[in-house]
Amino acid sequence: MNPAETLLAQTLAANAAAGYPDIDRSAAARGERARHQAYLARKHRIEGLPAPPADSLEARLVRHHIDGDISAAQLIAITRLLPR
């Protein structure tokens, strides 16, 4: 398992155990995060960047963020560990 996968697993477990501290998991918050991610996806398409494969770690990170499993700060920290 690479460092990003390891940190994601640890973060998911810690957030679940702590009751998702400081993460708004309401339907409205999920909708807002989904709208923001859709905006970023459109922006990336315009810039010519390919969408990540649906089963990739990057795509799973976005889904976990939208669902409120990880915070924006945690998303960024894990994304920085992705291989380039």
Q: At which residue positions do the language-model features occur?
A:
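Acidic, Ser/Pro/Thr-rich low-complexity regulatory regions
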Residues: 2-67, 71-84
